[in-house]
């Protein structure tokens, strides 16, 4: 069975699609369009990596659904260990800033 025939891979693709939609919803159309093209031709790895980078760079608040799906994708396969670690560190730092009063939280999607 090829990797792309497994439910785990389908969830990885869904995560990439969710990140692309998230970027588009926040006005980052160039990034979203580029990642969509990469997803269509090369699979979800680079779009997920780019999504994490954009979330961190633009200081965005990911949805709870995205956080949950990313955790599930990470638990099921090793494809995104580095990106998941960056994502979790970013979320922890945002939580620490929020608790210390340094950050006014934007509304979550």
Protein language model features and the residues they cover:
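C-terminal-biased regions
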Residues: 1-109
């Amino acid at each position: 069975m090829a990797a792309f025939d497994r439910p785990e891979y389908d969830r990885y693709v869904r995560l990439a699609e969710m990140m692309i939609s998230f970027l588009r919803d926040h006005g980052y159309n160039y990034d979203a369009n580029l990642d969509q093209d990469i997803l269509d031709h090369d699979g979800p790895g680079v779009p997920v990596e780019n999504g994490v980078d954009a979330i961190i760079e633009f200081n965005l608040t990911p949805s709870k659904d995205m956080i949950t799906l990313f955790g599930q994708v990470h638990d099921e396969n090793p494809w995104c260990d580095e990106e998941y670690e960056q994502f979790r560190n970013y979320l922890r730092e945002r939580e620490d800033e929020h608790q210390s009063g340094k950050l006014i939280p934007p509304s979550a999607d």
